[in-house]
């Protein structure tokens, strides 16, 4: 039994160390002027795991650069955007992987966060990979309905929770 537990811990540590979330492209809905952009950026700058922020105001997109080995909190990003009076149109992470084999319904623990890969084929991830967060509040209502239809067999997509975890985020490759 001890051998089995040790194997499980080593496997989990391997999964955790095979990834590094580097940055995110955050599309914000409702930005209409420079003051709106300033208010949003000011809120985002209060997040401790963000190292720096770039922006593309023509596309209402912020590039969030994360501190090395930071524990990323997607709900905090969402909360800060909403505190500024806006909503998220999309959140696309760029993460660096080393030989991480995934398939549909694969679960990845990164730091303290559980991610569930949906609508993906079996593939080995190497280098920088773009991952779209597809949970409610991180995509448009239309996209959420489309993903929800594809995810009918995954109750965690509807609730955002797994039986053995407080929160689970759902990702797809792009």
Residue ranges and their predicted role:
Residues 6, 54-55, 91:
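Residue-level detector of family-conserved "landmark" positions at structurally sensitive sites
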Residues 40, 74-85:
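Short amphipathic alpha-helices in soluble, non-transmembrane regions
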């Amino acid at each position: 039994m001890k051998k089995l537990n040790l194997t499980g811990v080593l496997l989990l540590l391997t999964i955790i160390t095979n990834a590094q979330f580097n940055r995110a492209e955050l599309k914000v809905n409702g930005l209409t002027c420079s003051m709106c952009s300033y208010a949003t950026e000011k809120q985002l700058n209060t997040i401790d795991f963000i190292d720096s922020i770039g922006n593309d105001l023509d596309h209402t997109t912020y590039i969030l650069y994360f501190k090395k080995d930071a524990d990323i909190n997607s709900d905090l990003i969402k909360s800060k955007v909403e505190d500024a009076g806006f909503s998220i149109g999309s959140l696309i992470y760029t993460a660096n992987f080393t030989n991480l084999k995934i398939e549909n319904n694969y679960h990845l623990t990164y730091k303290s966060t559980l991610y569930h890969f949906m609508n993906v084929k079996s593939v080995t991830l190497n280098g920088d990979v773009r991952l779209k967060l597809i949970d409610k509040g991180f995509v448009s209502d239309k996209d959420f309905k489309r993903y929800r239809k594809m995810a009918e067999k995954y109750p965690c997509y509807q609730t955002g929770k797994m039986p053995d975890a407080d929160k689970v985020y759902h990702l797809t490759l792009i």
